[in-house]
Design a protein with these regions (language model features):
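Rossmann-like NAD(P)(H) cofactor-binding subdomain of soluble oxidoreductases
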Residues: 37, 46-47, 55-60, 64-131, ...
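A short glycine-threonine-serine/GTX helix/turn-capping micro-motif
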Residues: 166-175, 196, 224
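NAD(P)+-binding Rossmann beta1-loop-alpha1 motif at the extreme N-terminus of oxidoreductases
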Residues: 1-60, 189-190
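Internal alpha-helical scaffold of NAD(P)-dependent oxidoreductase catalytic cores
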Residues: 102-112, 128-165, 178-215
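Small-residue helix-packing motif on alpha-helices
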Residues: 30, 40, 58, 194-202, ...
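NAD(P)-dependent Rossmann-like dehydrogenase/reductase catalytic/cofactor-binding core
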Residues: 203-270
Length: 270
């Protein structure tokens, strides 16, 4: 199986690192194109992958082709490569706001499309991806792509109408988490904890808490209640967060990201 990437931005680099670290394909089975060779040089030096500046060459060689370019560049890239793409290839799109219908329309023919919203924790093998596909993708082909994304984290099949929600909660989600870690660490530093230790305490607390949710199967509210002793320190802090509107702020932020993704999709369809 030959896996190709057109574009080598942060998301693509995270995915490629995860794929090669987990040995999903060998470096010789992975080809990446990018207009700037500097972007691919690090991956080439580290893993020995095949790199080029020729998008058509990647399209020709790939069994599974990942389009990892900015949404505004999609039409130009698809126009460039569409004559090289066959009905046997699987096209994976990871751009926000680009629907499968829009991508297929740009190709101007029936193509197998899997739309995915991954996130950057793929770089450390802890990504979260939502996947859907069009009617030309077989169950076996979808499973193959699903396994690729599971190699660097968790992956869930969804319907395309839920992609906006996935963008809001997990595609953009790491940024919210980093802000929370930063805020917790700042508060700890204000209380005298050294900066480096403050980040470790904050980040590990979020990591451990997330694993508790995933591995125990308990409701997050139930786990929260278990930490809140009567008249204790935790319930005092929770009370402040509730007064300051933490829940509503997070809900509004996720909703705003989802709405923005929906708006981007509408613009692409015009």
């Amino acid at each position: 199986m030959k896996l190709g990437f057109i574009g080598c931005g942060n998301m693509a680099q995270a995915m490629i690192t995860g794929i090669l670290t987990q040995k999903v394909v060998s470096p010789q089975e992975l080809i990446v194109s990018n207009p700037r060779e500097k972007k691919t040089a690090k991956l080439k030096d580290e893993f020995g992958i095949i790199t080029t500046t020729d998008n058509k060459e990647v399209a020709k060689q790939s069994d599974i082709l990942v389009l990892s370019v900015k949404p505004q560049v999609y039409p130009a890239v698809i126009k460039e490569i569409r004559d090289e793409v066959s009905s046997e290839q699987i096209i994976v799109t990871i751009a926000a706001g680009v629907s499968m219908e829009a991508a297929e329309r740009q190709f101007g023919k029936e193509v197998k499309i899997v739309r995915v919203m991954p996130n950057t924790p793929a770089l450390v093998g802890e990504g979260m991806s939502g996947l859907c596909c069009n009617e030309y993708v077989t169950e076996e082909e979808f499973d193959l792509v699903h396994k690729i994304f599971e190699s660097f984290g968790k992956a869930e099949k969804i319907t395309e109408n839920l992609m906006d929600a996935v963008v809001g909660v997990s595609g953009s989600g790491p940024a919210y988490v980093y802000m929370f870690i930063e805020a917790m660490a700042d508060a700890a530093v204000a209380q005298g904890l050294p900066r480096k230790q403050a980040y470790t305490f904050a980040a590990q607390t979020l990591l451990g808490s997330a694993k508790m949710v995933l591995e125990t199967g308990q409701h997050p509210g139930e786990l929260k209640d278990a930490v809140c002793s009567p008249a204790g320190t935790t319930i005092e802090a929770v009370n402040v967060l509730e007064k300051k509107g933490m829940r509503s702020a997070v809900i509004e932020a996720v909703t705003a990201a989802a709405k923005k993704n929906h708006q981007l999709g509408k613009k692409k369809e015009k």
